[in-house]
């Protein structure tokens, strides 16, 4: 069970190949190709969001894939946090 004051961010939330119905929460322009859990963690650390990694968790819509998730501080809206994480990952990838 997640802690109060934390947001759950799944790699699926930032994945460009997913639809909104499939779990993406930011625009396709802002989203990423195949985001990895370690990239999400590194970006959240860089943004000082105090990430807690839960690598064994499975995204409910794709229960057969073990994608993992991170819990980050709930300082602002989830979509804003997701956009910042995606932007940081894009910069780290060199794009």
Swiss-Prot record:
Chief place of localization: cytoplasm
Cellular-component GO terms for this entry: signal recognition particle
Zinc in keyword set: no
Domain of life of the organism encoding this protein: Archaea
Function: Involved in targeting and insertion of nascent membrane proteins into the cytoplasmic membrane. Binds directly to 7S RNA and mediates binding of the 54 kDa subunit of the SRP.
NCBIfam families, A to Z: PRK00754.1
Protein name: Signal recognition particle 19 kDa protein
Taxonomic lineage: Archaea, Methanobacteriati, Methanobacteriota, Stenosarchaea group, Methanomicrobia
């Amino acid at each position: 069970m997640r802690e109060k004051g934390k947001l759950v961010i799944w790699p699926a939330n930032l994945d460009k190949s997913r639809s909104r119905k499939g779990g993406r929460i930011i625009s396709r322009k802002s989203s990423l190709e195949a985001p990895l859990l370690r990239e999400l963690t590194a970006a959240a650390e860089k943004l000082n969001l105090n990430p807690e990694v839960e690598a064994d968790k499975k995204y409910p819509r794709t229960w057969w894939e073990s994608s993992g998730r991170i819990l980050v501080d709930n300082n602002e809206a989830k979509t804003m946090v997701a956009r910042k994480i995606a932007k940081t990952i894009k910069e780290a990838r060199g794009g």
